[in-house]
Swiss-Prot record:
<keyword id="KW-0479">Metal-binding</keyword>
<protein>
    <recommendedName>
        <fullName>Pyruvate decarboxylase</fullName>
        <ecNumber>4.1.1.1</ecNumber>
    </recommendedName>
</protein>
<feature type="binding site">
    <location>
        <position position="478"/>
    </location>
    <ligand>
        <name>Mg(2+)</name>
    </ligand>
</feature>
<dbReference type="GO" id="GO:0000287">
    <property type="term" value="F:magnesium ion binding"/>
</dbReference>
<dbReference type="InterPro" id="IPR011766">
    <property type="entry name" value="TPP_enzyme_TPP-bd"/>
</dbReference>
<dbReference type="GO" id="GO:0005829">
    <property type="term" value="C:cytosol"/>
</dbReference>
<dbReference type="InterPro" id="IPR029061">
    <property type="entry name" value="THDP-binding"/>
</dbReference>
<dbReference type="InterPro" id="IPR012001">
    <property type="entry name" value="Thiamin_PyroP_enz_TPP-bd_dom"/>
</dbReference>
<feature type="binding site">
    <location>
        <begin position="421"/>
        <end position="423"/>
    </location>
    <ligand>
        <name>thiamine diphosphate</name>
    </ligand>
</feature>
<keyword id="KW-0456">Lyase</keyword>
<dbReference type="InterPro" id="IPR047214">
    <property type="entry name" value="TPP_PDC_IPDC"/>
</dbReference>
<dbReference type="Pfam" id="PF02776">
    <property type="entry name" value="TPP_enzyme_N"/>
</dbReference>
<feature type="binding site">
    <location>
        <position position="38"/>
    </location>
    <ligand>
        <name>pyruvate</name>
    </ligand>
</feature>
<comment type="subunit">
    <text>Homotetramer.</text>
</comment>
<feature type="binding site">
    <location>
        <position position="480"/>
    </location>
    <ligand>
        <name>Mg(2+)</name>
    </ligand>
</feature>
<feature type="binding site">
    <location>
        <position position="451"/>
    </location>
    <ligand>
        <name>Mg(2+)</name>
    </ligand>
</feature>
<feature type="binding site">
    <location>
        <position position="124"/>
    </location>
    <ligand>
        <name>pyruvate</name>
    </ligand>
</feature>
Length: 569
């Protein structure tokens, strides 16, 4: 048979599914999220032999959120769904990962190539013989597409997709038909690791850009550094920290850049988000005559409703594909090489002192006798409680904005979805992040989610239990969708939710004695819980009902909601 002859010509025959999963293992993936379906079942059989753990999520949307959280800690992740019904259920999560530059390899089990070619009337189709329609839907939210329909190009398509996923830090799509799963291809390619290195900048062009940057930096009287999400996603944090240390410049982060820099350093100044900033932060950033802006994403929620008051004339923007110095843009220049040379050639710069922030309570809370847990009181207290290397996940809503007022210990990772803003995201992301943390010697994973958002994706508590994960989940119980109340419909029924017995939920998911539940209604109760050694040692999944006023929110959320309401009118 022709197939046998072709196989005999291979030096190291390997099945396509094994090749794919071994490549994923090579780039650091150790667990695969997803939901089984008849078009991907045979592929899942290969996971154990490739050293990969099957997570098994409750639905594809949650699996996508979990893959997002896993990738933000691990560097890259993999998601497996089935054709049509499965892949479409995951697309909200994939779109969020695309918008926020999170690398997920989305593998879709597809019908037999013969069935596709013949346009058969199969289940999970639209009944019109079009087997390309769903992949096309993913095309706009994937940075590479690999349709594995021809054996001779499979290895190249897999390698290219994974490499693009890593380098561009965005999702890719791999379609894997049932008959291709077991096809033999050349496994000798696996002896050569994928080249995940960035293409170098043109040396002459890079040197010119560095000289221009240094000219303005040396002339500046009070320059500052502003770090945002793409500095994290495009892996330039080493360069950012070197710049921060070598220059001594006041360094700030945007909300999406929270956790990007070591907040214990003396020149860390806090979160800059326009009018939502601490007044001292706002004054120092907006009065600067040169802002080194690294990886900026100037979205509405990241800027407190587009309230930045910094001009392009005083800004140098560093990005993964270009550098913009004032109004001059230099395309095809990656910021990594430029930042490295700027640090090497910097010399003396004018570094003004920064007002050091702390987790001290604001003046109006210091002498308060109130036992009500307000946002103004909560978030500095959270900062006092957090430990080095914690992973802190905050849901779209009050938590996303409240965390701006928390100064982190060293090496804390922050996860949020400020740009895409899909409520419920954080619960799935917590599962994925906690799994990646478990692979990294049990970093502590802490989630703050609202009671409304929790109801969208609560099933992932079941997945946490199934995978023996021990996050601390704080559920802010404030009777519904607070952020939406501040935008529109304060007392309307559509912003209300059905109250749940939240601390009892793990029992429903089969936890039995593998969890602890708490109900916290006063400041003293929370302070006591934070001082509890057993609680802090995270012996198991812990779920904390955190009861807060219905009408309370961080000031930055109120300002952003007001701006959103104005734009929607």
């Amino acid at each position: 048979m022709a197939t046998d002859i072709a196989t005999k010509e291979l030096h190291k025959p390997v099945d396509v599914a094994e090749y794919l999963f071994r490549r994923l293992y090579e780039v650091g993936v150790r667990a695969v999220h997803g939901v089984p379906g008849d078009y991907n079942l045979a592929a899942l059989d290969y996971l154990p032999k490739c050293g990969l753990h099957w997570v098994g999520n409750c639905n594809e949307l949650n699996a996508g959120y979990a893959a997002d959280g896993y990738a933000r800690i691990n560097g890259i992740s993999a998601l497996v769904t089935t054709f049509g019904v499965g892949e479409l259920s995951a697309l909200n999560a994939i779109a969020g990962a695309y918008s926020e530059f999170v690398p997920i390899v989305h593998i879709v089990g597809q019908p037999h190539t013969r069935s596709q070619r013949d346009g058969m009337l199969l289940h999970h189709t639209l009944g019109n013989g079009d087997f390309n329609v769903f992949a096309k839907m993913s095309g706009g939210i994937s940075c590479a597409m690999g349709r594995l329909n021809e054996t001779h190009e499979v290895a190249t398509l897999i390698d290219n997709a994974i490499r693009e996923c890593w380098l561009r830090s965005r999702p890719v799509y791999i379609g894997l038909p049932t008959d291709i799963i077991v096809k033999k291809i050349e496994g000798q390619r696996l002896d050569t690791p994928l080249d995940l290195s960035l293409p170098p900048n043109d040396p002459e062009k890079e040197d010119y850009v560095v000289d221009v940057v240094l000219k303005y930096l040396h002339a500046a009287k009070n320059p500052v550094i502003l770090v945002d999400a793409c500095a994290i996603r495009h892996r330039v944090l080493d360069e950012v920290h070197d710049l921060m240390e070598t220059s001594g410049l006041p360094t700030f982060v945007a909300p999406m850049g929270k956790g990007a820099v070591d907040e214990t350093r003396k020149n860390y100044g806090g979160v800059y988000a326009g009018t939502g900033s601490n007044p001292g932060v706002r004054e120092q950033v907006e009065s600067s005559d040169l802002i080194l802006s690294i990886g900026a994403i100037k979205s509405d929620f990241n800027t407190t409703g587009f309230s930045y008051r910094i001009g392009q004339l005083n800004t140098i923007d560093f990005h993964s594909t270009y550098v913009r110095v004032r109004y001059s843009e230099y395309p095809d220049i990656n910021m990594k090489g430029v930042l490295r040379k700027v640090v090497q050639r910097m010399g003396h710069v004018n570094a003004l002192p920064v007002q050091r922030l702390s987790n001290a309570l604001p003046d109006n809370e210091k002498g308060s006798s109130s036992q009500e847990i307000t946002h103004a009181w909560l978030w500095p207290i959270v900062g006092q409680w957090l430990k080095e290397r914690d992973i802190v996940i905050t849901e779209t809503g009050t938590a996303n904005f409240g965390i701006w007022d928390t100064r982190f210990p060293a090496n804390v990772t922050a996860i949020s979805q400020v740009l895409w803003g899909s409520i419920g995201y954080s619960v799935g992301a917590c599962q994925g992040a906690a799994l990646a943390a478990k692979e990294q010697n049990n970093r502590r994973t802490v989630l703050f989610v609202g009671d409304g958002s929790l109801q969208l994706t609560v099933q992932e508590i079941s997945t946490m239990i199934r995978n023996n994960l021990n996050p601390i989940v704080f559920v802010i119980c404030n009777q519904g969708y607070t952020i939406e109340r501040f935008i529109h419909g304060w007392d309307e029924a559509y912003n209300d939710i059905q109250p749940w017995d939240i601390k009892g939920l793990p029992v429903v998911f089969g936890a039995k004695d593998k969890y602890k539940g708490y109900r916290v209604k006063t400041r003293d109760e929370l302070t006591k819980l934070f001082a509890n050694d057993e609680f802090n040692s995270v012996p198991c999944l812990q779920l904390v009902e955190l009861h807060m006023p219905r009408d309370d929110a961080p000031a930055s959320l109120k300002l952003t909601a007001e701006s959103a309401a104005h734009r929607n009118a």
